[in-house]
Amino acid sequence: MNVVKTDKKGRFSLPGFEKTRFISITTPAGFETQQFYLPVKENRKSYDFLLTESERTQPREHSFVQITDTEVTGGMGRWVTDLQQYVKNEKPAFLIHTGDICYEPGLKMHNQVVNAETMNCPVYYCIGNHDLVKGNYGEELYESIYGPTWYSFDIGNIHYVVTPIDHGDNPTDYTQRDVYNWLKNDLAMMKKDQSLILFNHDLFTPGDTFVFKADNEHILDFRTFNTKAQLYGHMHYNYVRNQNGIYTICTGTLDKGGIDHSPSSFREIKVDGNDNITTQLRYTFIEPQIAIVSPMNNQISAATGDRLPVSVNTYHAQAKTSHVSYILSDIENNQEIAKGNLISL
């Protein structure tokens, strides 16, 4: 609930809050930690966090991967390998799962397979409506495995904020007022020139105003915090909309496709040196493919002088295409005529 800055020696003191179950840190840009939160224990007087320097969380230009709604109650699938290899090859700054992990079996299983060690990058989670399960309160099991339902971290010049869904299969212990109070305190610590990206399992702020309203008296206008995007899942479809400079981005599932008939996919988001974002989907379950588009069999090519345009399509679920090489040979005697690398368009 309360948010404070450490002193020069890294020491801090937090006021109490009756619902406090975790002490968490906003991991600063240029650093990583194996655990950004610690459970609160009775009679414990200090909470210490170990930070290590990190080159991948420092650059203003960086990328991250979003997955969502894996709903792994029946077990994990081949998508895990595609995701793992893509992260290994493309080296995003972090991976985030925006909720619906799902139910007791999924909650207990998912973090054993998709975590910072198996993915070799920081991994974060949001709580979804199907992650609010039976217990003393809906988020109890989630918290015991994944930690707090709200937290933040910095990478490059972006302040990333994870927020909890406000509804689900079982009642939550947190309220929208609790979320507002923490958000207000957290955002107050942003640096003057920082930008903001928000995560939630569902659409956090509907409409073009980007206002979070806990009640009539407690309101946050995210446009005043240089917000660049809000990302979510829940709907099982792919959607990107630029709303007067702020992107609203919904991502479908990488294991079963979307209800909009979109293929199974996860999302990569790139942040440039001015904090502007671009995004593309990466499709799962696709083995390395290459197809010559032009010239085609039994067709006359559009050759000009000694130039022969060659066009190919390539794709692989586990990596982007780095280059395409070619060899041109005489069909009658198989003699090599030319070879080289094609230029990406």
Briefly describe each language-model feature range.
Residues 2-11:
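Short, acidic Ser/Thr/Gly-rich low-complexity loop/linker segments typical of extracellular
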Residues 13-22:
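Short Pro-Gly-centered beta-turn/loop motif in secreted/extracellular proteins
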Residues 22-109:
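N-terminal active-site segment of His-dependent metallophosphoesterases
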Residues 27-43, 107-190, 215-229, 237-273:
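Extended active-site neighborhood of metal-dependent phosphoesterases/phosphodiesterases
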Residues 69, 99-100, 128-129, 201, ...:
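Active-site glycine-centered loops adjacent to acidic/histidine catalytic or metal-binding residues
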Residues 85-94, 170-248, 300-312, 316-327:
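His/acidic metal-ligating clusters that form di-metal
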Residues 246-316, 320-325:
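Binuclear metal-dependent phosphoesterase catalytic core
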Residues 311, 322-345:
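Long, low-complexity serine/threonine/glycine- and acidic-rich segments characteristic of extracellular
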